Amino acid sequence: MKKILLMLLCVSVLGCSKNSVESEKPVDVLLIGGGIMSATLGTYLNELEPGWTIEMVERLDKVAEESSNGWNNAGTGHSAFCELNYTSEAADGSMDISKAVAINENFEISKQFWAYQVDRKVLNDPKSFINNVPHMSFVWGDDNVAFLKKRHAALQHSSLFRGMEYSEDPEQIKQWVPLVMEGREPGQKIAATRMSIGTDVNFGEITRQLVGSLSAKDTFKLRLQHEVRDLKRNDDNTWTVTMADLANGDKETSVKARFVFIGAGGGALKLLQMSGIPEAEGYAGFPVGGSFLATTNPDVVKRHLAKVYGKASVGSPPMSVPHLDTRMIDGKPVLLFGPFATFSTKFLKNGSLWDLPGSVTSGNIGPMFNAGIDNFDLSQYLIGQLMLSQDDRMASLREYFPEARDEDWKLVQAGQRVQIIKKDAEKGGVLQFGTEVVTAADGSVAALLGASPGASTAAPIMLSVLEKAFKDKVATPEWQARLKEIVPSYGRKLNNDIELTNSTRAWSSERLQLIHVPVQPEA
C-alpha cells in the first residue's frame, strides 16, 4: 500500500511539474522586444562586457517586424535638416533652433555607432541600410516662405547646418525636385531648403544585422515567438520574467535577470506597468497609426531623389507633417507620401484591440482625461484624417506632386506609435510627443516609451540607458575608453566646434559610404 501511495505521489509531482513554469539559470541582461532599440543596447553591452549573458525575447517569428520594419516608418535619418517642427518661432519673432541642434547631434552619434559596427564587420554593406538622399523643406504662401527664410538664417549660426541651400527661384527648385514643380501654378510664392548630406535609413536592416551578429555569440540567446506574461522583482533586486512559448502550446518558462530592458515599442507601457516600479506610476499611452501613399512606378521614382518635408497645418500635431520621400526598402526604390493618421486601440501593429483599455489604471486615468481635454485639436485632426477618402489623399499628394496620377499610387498601412501621456503638476496630465526612458531607482529595469524621432536616435538613447542603469560602470576608465571607441565624439558637443564636426562626419561618412561636405566657418 505504501509503495502504491509513493508511486501515485511521484506521478502527481511529475504531472504538476510538466504544467508548472520551467525555470532556467539567471542571465545578466534580458532584452524584451526585437527592434532596433534592444538590438542597439545588446550590441553596446556585448562590446562593453563580452562575458555578460544576454537574452532577447520577441513575440513575433522574426525580429524588426514592428516599428523597425522598413514599411512601418518613414526611414528618415532625422537630422532636423528638413523637419520644420523641430524649430519654433517665438512671439517676438526669434527662431529657437535648440531642438534642431539636439536632434542633429543625436543622429551624428547614431552614424558613429553604425560606422564603428561596419569597422567591426557587425554591420555589412552600408548601402544595404543607409544612403544619401537630400533633405528638403518646401513651402508656399507668404507667411510660410517668411518662416522658412528666417529658419534657414537662424540655422546658419550652427556649424551643424552650414551648407544648407535656400532658394525661392522656381527654376532652381525644379532642378532639385522636378516632380514637385511640374504642373505647379505659375507665380505661386514658394521656397525650399536643401541639405545634400541627408540620409534614408532602413532601420529594419540594421536591426537584423545587429541581432545576427549577436546570435553568433555563445553568450547570446534569441527567443522568437515568446511573449512575456509576468515580470516580478526578487528580494535580491533581480527580476523573474515569465514568458510563454507561442509556438509550443504556450509552455511557460521563467528567466531570472540582473537587468531587464523593455524595448517593446508600443508594447512597452503594459510591460512597464507589469513591473510595478513606482517610477511607472501615472504613465499612459495614446496609440496613433499611420498610412502612406506609395508608388514603385520606375518612371516616377527615378525622377525624384529627395525627402521633401512641408509645414503642418495650424493646430495639427507634429506627426502630421506631410512629406514626399525617396525610400530604399529591401534594395528597391520607392516613393512614399504621407503620413495619414489612422486609429486603432492596438499598441502594436500586431497587437490586440484590448491594448488601450487594458492599459488604463487608477493611477493614469486622471492624466489621460486631462490630456484629452487639453488636446482637442488632436481629436479633431484624427477625426478629419479618418474621414479622408482616396480622392482626398490624392489631393494632398498633388500639393507636393501636382501631376500625380491615381493609378500609380496605393495606400499602405505603416506602424503603430504610442504617444506618452504623463502626470503634470499644473495640468494634471500632458500628451508628450517624443521618447522617454523610465528607469527603476536601482537601475535594474529600464523601459523606452514614446515615438518620434525614434529609431534615428537609437544609439544616443541607449547611451542614456547605460548612463542611468549602469551609472557606476559608465564612470569607470574601462567603459569610458570603450565608449569613446564606439562613439568617438562621446562626451563632447559637435555644435560650433568646426574641427570636431568635420573630423567626426568625415570618419563616419567614409565608413558608411556617405558624401562628406566639410563645414566652413560662419560668414
UniProtKB/Swiss-Prot annotation:
Task: Identify the InterPro entries for this entry.
Answer: FAD/NAD-bd_sf (IPR036188), MQO (IPR006231)
What cofactor does this one take? FAD
Pfam family of the protein (one) = Mqo
Top-level taxonomic group: Bacteria
Keywords of this protein's UniProt record, alphabetized? FAD, Flavoprotein, Oxidoreductase, Tricarboxylic acid cycle
Record has Signal as a keyword: no
Q: Which GO terms describe its cellular component?
A: cytoplasm
EC number annotated for this UniProt entry:
1.1.5.4
Tagged with keyword Transmembrane: no
Q: In which pathway does it act?
A: Carbohydrate metabolism; tricarboxylic acid cycle; oxaloacetate from (S)-malate (quinone route): step 1/1
GO BP terms, alphabetized: tricarboxylic acid cycle
Q: What class of enzyme is it?
A: oxidoreductase
Catalytic activity from the UniProt record: (S)-malate + a quinone = a quinol + oxaloacetate
- Listed GO MF terms: L-malate dehydrogenase (quinone) activity
Q: Give the protein family.
A: Belongs to the MQO family.
Known HAMAP family for this protein?
MQO
Do you know which NCBIfam families this protein is assigned to? Answer: mal_quin_oxido (TIGR01320), PRK05257.1-1 (NF003603), PRK05257.1-4 (NF003605), PRK05257.2-1 (NF003606), PRK05257.2-4 (NF003608), PRK05257.2-5 (NF003609), PRK05257.3-2 (NF003611), PRK05257.3-3 (NF003612)
Listed name of the protein: Probable malate:quinone oxidoreductase 1
Q: Which organism is it from?
A: Pseudomonas aeruginosa (strain ATCC 15692 / DSM 22644 / CIP 104116 / JCM 14847 / LMG 12228 / 1C / PRS 101 / PAO1)
Q: What is the lineage of its organism?
A: Bacteria, Pseudomonadati, Pseudomonadota, Gammaproteobacteria, Pseudomonadales
- The gene designation is mqo1
